[in-house]
Amino acid sequence: MATDSWALAVDEQEAAVKSMSNLQIKEEKVKPDTNGVIKTNATPEKTDEEEKEDRAAQSLLNKLIRSNLVDNTNQVEVLQRDPNSPLYSVKSFEELRLKPQLLQGVYAMGFNRPSKIQENALPMMLAEPPQNLIAQSQSGTGKTAAFVLAMLSRVEPAERYPQCLCLSPTYELALQTGKVIEQMGKFHPELKLAYAVRGNKLERGQKISEHIVIGTPGTVLDWCSKLKFIDPKKIKVFVLDEADVMIATQGHQDQSIRIQRMLPRNCQMLLFSATFEDSVWKFAQKVVPDPNIIKLKREEETLDTIKQYYVLCNSRDEKFQALCNIYGAITIAQAMIFCHTRKTASWLAAELSKEGHQVALLSGEMVVEQRAAVIERFREGKEKVLVTTNVCARGIDVEQVSVVINFDLPVDKDGNPDNETYLHRIGRTGRFGKRGLAVNMVDSKHSMNILNRIQEHFNKKIERLDTDDLDEIEKIAN
């Protein structure tokens, strides 16, 4: 496999991990029927806020479903610890002066050159003396392989004790990182890797001889302090991956800070996060002293290419009839329909299936592998309608999605408009430079108020659509 895309190849390697049998979000089993509708045994009424996906599962889902490199045209912003020092970037791996075995491992994985963000990040991560780094890197930019390369570069194989420590929010994400280490380090057979995760039992008093330890914060903290399997004073590189996921998990933030405080002052600290909201930034500053900072400026999602409409209804059945009228009047390549609860989504998927539509259902009670399979089938066009809750409002790029329907408008836990979710939902259409269409179902004074506030927030007019008038529906498709 030869490719110019370092990050794409990394992600293909990561997505190739098959040992995902433990990725249960809930114990409940969900199976698609012959029509592609996924029917659940129990559909408890859950609010959108409760349905918002656990970040760790979402991160893992992104790794499994991504078949293309995230658009890498965005600008990289570099803030150096010492603004007077020269800013180095590289266009080839040879410039990094890697150990021959590591360079061989990089090429064996199919990489020809660094991606845009690594051009700046790798020289900092491999510099002497070591430099600390905080990097914003969304899923798909190849950051896992970048920090793996940094760890492997620092290890002295002859020293039989842990020298690099990597924290991941979950066992499954730690496993993804471990696979990349094994692949990149395969020409370094003397390099050893250990997983500090719950269930990995060691004898009390035992010392670990592996060079790199990957694990979850709670277990790593136990291994460093209570059980003393690891001598934290000998750690050279400390990586904190998925920081935004980490701080969303109760206890992980405090545990990570406690681990960091045990490390020597000259330990290299590397922190990665997909987002840089205030809570993540405060956390990063606590664990990474005197950092260089790299931010990948993200393309703003826009509503400019999306025509927005609303339909007035009095009940759930009227909303369904309006939906049927839209389908009867215009040709829809593929559509995504968002619901407020799992119960509504399950009902709607079944009703659409009865009408002869090829329907798939996606919700948070499914295991991650099932979700990835449903999304892939939708991407391939095997189902034309995807009914979902907020579980996949982000990150799914399907070129054929021409219509997004908000069967229920997105609100937060206090009943206020969730403008960000609205943007991400209808942003699934109008992509790749094409015109998109968004239809919002309004069934009460409250939801009309929500719609008006969304309209004011984005300063974009949302037109009324009469779905009883077929001529009017036909016009919106032009």
From Swiss-Prot:
The modification N-acetylalanine is found at residue 2. Residues 305-473 form the Helicase C-terminal domain. It is found in: Cytoplasm; Nucleus, Nucleoplasm. Residues 31-55 are annotated as: Disordered. ATP binds at residues 118, 137-144, 428, 431. There is a cross-link at residue 26 (Glycyl lysine isopeptide (Lys-Gly) (interchain with G-Cter in SUMO2)). A motif (Q motif) lies at residues 91-119. Disulfide bonds: none annotated. Its EC number is 3.6.4.13. Keywords: Acetylation, ATP-binding, Cytoplasm, Helicase, Hydrolase, Isopeptide bond, Nucleotide-binding, Nucleus, RNA-binding, Ubl conjugation. ATP-dependent RNA helicase involved in mRNA export from the nucleus. Rather than unwinding RNA duplexes, DDX19 functions as a remodeler of ribonucleoprotein particles, whereby proteins bound to nuclear mRNA are dissociated and replaced by cytoplasmic mRNA binding proteins. This is ATP-dependent RNA helicase DDX19A.
